[in-house]
Amino acid sequence: MPYFVVVRERGSAWDWSVPMRRQAEWDSHAAFMDALDAEGFIVAGGPLGTEDAAAHVMHIVNAPDSETIEARMAEDPWTPMELLKTVSIEPWTVLLGGFRER
């Protein structure tokens, strides 16, 4: 199954005065992301830059296509709350490192 790089950014409802782990519905969002990790859908991910100052989050996703990724990210509790939104989904050709096919 191919890899994709998914970039999400903080949405209009993000409260910049509050740390990431204290945003509304953090526990629900974290449980959702942990489940995607456990099933191997997300193989790596996290904020770009320092955790609480980062405007963007990057994930390496193992999925058949971008439509599947869009559908799964829409299930994140933070998506309809406008805390996070997906801004790009790009196929990733891995040439170096542990993610490449051998």
Q: Where would I find each of the regions flagged by the language model?
A:
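Conserved, structured core segments of small domains
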Residues: 1-102
